């Protein structure tokens, strides 16, 4: 049995195998992050699904590591990357974010949209290069008013995720998304090389 075979993988595999074909439209947060003047280096897309954001980063010349628990989503992404001539830039990684961790200080951009786990966020913050950007969007507790089946731990608490950033980050954007009526919150933050001793 696949060591990752578990309820999350089965649920997402079923969704991607039977749902509509992915649009591969990049997430607006990814588009914003890619336009921020990133340092040299690769991009990490966490809980990526069949990610148009990973493709947009590759089209901008970035190497991309795209991690997801769904092997079906990763096959769709890999096929689209190959169709666009980007197969050499997009590296799908079949991983469960509950245990998979990126190397520290390795990525110019770390992106995650639609997933929340405080430990994963902490590892992502450490994986961002100095000068690089951490881009995150996740459900807030308010989302549970419409979707009570969402576990509380999958939703941001007040002040998160910005309140969990290490001290070597500057917050660029921290706001609820208009589209979700405050049911989601997004963050863009840049890791600085060093703080002055003022």
What spans do the regions from the language model cover?
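Conserved SAM/SAH-binding beta-strand->alpha-helix loop
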Residues: 70-72
